């Protein structure tokens, strides 16, 4: 679905593990990495699209994850002019995304990128929470930064933190 402004309605998916790391996927046959994402079909809610894309791209189902949060607003990015398909109608100039923060609830061995009819990814790894903001293709950076900033306080509790501070050396 493309809205009246030329943006394709889309979902973005951030999957966290219990160590505060996020799932980072390598695009099929390319050297670029990104979060799973995909278009919203006619008649589909953002949440339905997210679960469909999660299965098609990562091989996970609703029972394999817990939805922690959804972005408050739609986040948009424009495609570079060289990537716009000017000959297709309606013309899509970018993506308008609803983002989801998920926590992995199953063993990571269930991740299977070969479930969809044409795989989007051919590799994946866990990375530190803020790593994707620095590493994603430049035209997506602002959207990634905004989504990750919104989810940060919710994602960080998954991480096992070391307690910082002075050690109590008082012996009474």
UniProtKB/Swiss-Prot annotation:
Its EC number is 3.6.1.-. Pfam families: NUDIX. The keyword Nucleotide-binding does not apply. Keywords: Hydrolase. This is RNA pyrophosphohydrolase. Its cofactor is a divalent metal cation. It comes from the Bacteria. GO terms for biological process: mRNA catabolic process. GO terms for molecular function: mRNA 5'-diphosphatase activity. Belongs to the Nudix hydrolase family. RppH subfamily. The lineage of its organism: Bacteria, Pseudomonadati, Pseudomonadota, Gammaproteobacteria, Vibrionales. Residues 6-149 form the Nudix hydrolase domain. One of its GO terms (cellular component) is cytoplasm. Accelerates the degradation of transcripts by removing pyrophosphate from the 5'-end of triphosphorylated RNA, leading to a more labile monophosphorylated state that can stimulate subsequent ribonuclease cleavage. The gene is rppH. A motif (Nudix box) lies at residues 38-59.
